[in-house]
Amino acid sequence: MAIKHLFTSESVSEGHPDKIADQISDAVLDAIFEQDPKARVACETYVKTGMVMVGGEITTSAWVDIEEITRQTVREIGYVHSDMGFDANSCAVLNTIGKQSPDINQGVDKADPKEQGAGDQGIMFGYATNETEVLMPAPITYAHRLMQRQAEVRKNGTLPWLRPDAKSQVTFQYDQGKIVGIDAVVLSTQHSDSISTADLREAVMEEIIKPVLPAEWLSKETKYFINPTGRFVIGGPMGDCGLTGRKIIVDTYGGAARHGGGAFSGKDPSKVDRSAAYAARYVAKNIVAAGMADRCEIQLSYAIGVADPTSIMVETFGTEKVSQEIIIEAVRQFFDLRPYGLQEMLNLLQPIYKKTAAYGHFGREEFPWEATDKAALLRDFAGLK
């Protein structure tokens, strides 16, 4: 690893057009799962000025009101008036949902549920590092926290002129792999026409940036770029169209780990793009929590209709405290990475997905794949004290 280097990650707010789409897709999934946890769902959403189109393939015994789910999701995000460029109450909602292909279904559903095949081929990665308390890379962790704070002060009235669309980016300085400071912070937020650029920049610094970023990492050399274009009134779906699955690096590790390319939102857990990526994070996090390595990346791969992974790779970047052979054997013994096994292991057949669709799928303790309940087992297995 370079002795000194910079690393940057970005996040986007719940009001970013792509995140609106992700949240609608996952809200549909959750609504269906409340009635039918065995449903097959692949829900895609497109948003643009004045309209939302929801499509995809869904096979279920449930009935859900797609239009009302869509409007309620947009409402909760905060687009409730045409002044913002998008209004949950008046936008058009188009529904183009069909059923899952029986050709796919025959490869997934088996007489013995434990032999459930993967819903598609693909590669998935999971990652963990001990540089933060949530075992996530610091740049993406703090980029998300800035966006969560933006939503908080927007919704609680502290900064009532804020609007839902926003982005953040944080550049960390590292020395021999350890954080030594924050080099740069970028935060752009949509706002009403009533606020001056100078007042906005001061308020964002005092109410969003300073409460979130640890003071010991900030210095006179830290650079701040707050609404660097000077004006951000037109935003949300009026500024850009949004699509489900277009923020896959924001959703995962901010570029600090590899990505298999598959998006998460709108997909039920039979889609290994989602469920196996969650399982890979769970494995990597437990390895790091057990003290077996400081950093760990897991790769899984699958073939459509086949239960067992076609490959499992463990990479610890030279930070392992026990041999690679012990780590690999521990993964084999303590983690069932077949589609049915990982659904059961992580209790994935429940309506928990809308919450994942903004501010990252990882590093948030409320999700089952963030548990470190196998760490003690792994420690004992590896002979670590």
Swiss-Prot record:
Which residues are ATP-binding?
Answer: 16, 165-167, 231-232, 240, 246-247, 263, 267
Metabolic or biological pathway, per its Swiss-Prot or TrEMBL entry: Amino-acid biosynthesis; S-adenosyl-L-methionine biosynthesis; S-adenosyl-L-methionine from L-methionine: step 1/1
Residues binding L-methionine are 57, 100, 240, 271
Domain of life of the organism in this record?
Bacteria
Gene3D superfamilies noted in UniProt = 3.30.300.10
Its localization reads: Cytoplasm
Pfam families for the chain: S-AdoMet_synt_C (PF02773), S-AdoMet_synt_M (PF02772), S-AdoMet_synt_N (PF00438)
Its main subcellular localisation, reduced to a broad class, is: cytoplasm
List GO terms (cellular component aspect). cytoplasm
Which top class of enzyme applies to this chain? transferase
User: Which parts of this chain are annotated as the region Flexible loop?
Assistant: 100-110
Q: Which GO terms describe its biological process?
A: one-carbon metabolic process; S-adenosylmethionine biosynthetic process
Q: Which residues bind Mg(2+)?
A: 18
Positions of K(+) binding: 44
- Recite the UniProt keywords alphabetically: ATP-binding, Cytoplasm, Magnesium, Metal-binding, Nucleotide-binding, One-carbon metabolism, Potassium, Transferase
Q: Which cofactor is recorded for it?
A: Mg(2+); K(+)
Q: Write down how the cofactor binds this protein.
A: Binds 2 divalent ions per subunit.
Q: Listed GO molecular functions? A: ATP binding; magnesium ion binding; methionine adenosyltransferase activity
Catalyzed chemical reaction(s): L-methionine + ATP + H2O = S-adenosyl-L-methionine + phosphate + diphosphate
UniProt EC number = 2.5.1.6
Quaternary context: Homotetramer; dimer of dimers.
Q: What does this protein do?
A: Catalyzes the formation of S-adenosylmethionine (AdoMet) from methionine and ATP. The overall synthetic reaction is composed of two sequential steps, AdoMet formation and the subsequent tripolyphosphate hydrolysis which occurs prior to release of AdoMet from the enzyme.
Stated family: Belongs to the AdoMet synthase family.
The record's annotation in HAMAP family points to: S_AdoMet_synth1 (MF_00086)
**What is the protein's name according to its record?**
S-adenosylmethionine synthase
Organism of this sequence: Vibrio cholerae serotype O1 (strain ATCC 39541 / Classical Ogawa 395 / O395)
- What lineage is this protein's organism placed in? Bacteria, Pseudomonadati, Pseudomonadota, Gammaproteobacteria, Vibrionales
